[in-house]
Swiss-Prot record:
Name under which the protein is recorded: Anti-adapter protein IraD
NCBIfam families (UniProt xref): PRK14128.1-1, PRK14128.1-3
Keyword tRNA processing on entry: no
Family: Belongs to the GpW/Gp25 family. IraD subfamily.
Role this protein plays: Inhibits RpoS proteolysis by regulating RssB activity, thereby increasing the stability of the sigma stress factor RpoS during oxidative stress. Its effect on RpoS stability is due to its interaction with RssB, which probably blocks the interaction of RssB with RpoS, and the consequent delivery of the RssB-RpoS complex to the ClpXP protein degradation pathway.
Amino acid sequence: MMRQSLQAVLPEISGNKTSLLRKSVCSDILTLFNSPHSALPSLLVSGMPEWQVHNQSDKHLQSWYCRQLRSALLFHEPRIAALQVNFKEAYCHTLAISLEIMLYHDGEPLTFDLVWDNGGWCSAMLENVS
């Protein structure tokens, strides 16, 4: 009887730790994006001002930025086991990036979307990460 109650409690504790890990990683990524002296590619620090001087529809340019971002994030965030980076929107006044993240010790993928807005990166998802 004692063993059954212990098994019922363990997944909840594990899930809570996973949720905290996910929120921590997302918060740290957002902080990295908004750091003025970040080691991320300049597009990802300065966002729209730099993006507007490029051909936003150039798929090769988008692919290059995604590779640069992936490399920088994997270097700066050791809790990420695997990462895929995609542009959701890349237009003259809109820049949105989606990160598909697999964390160590977490079997479920985490999707984290970032949007350039009013001179900085933000994510409406940060409050909803679980």
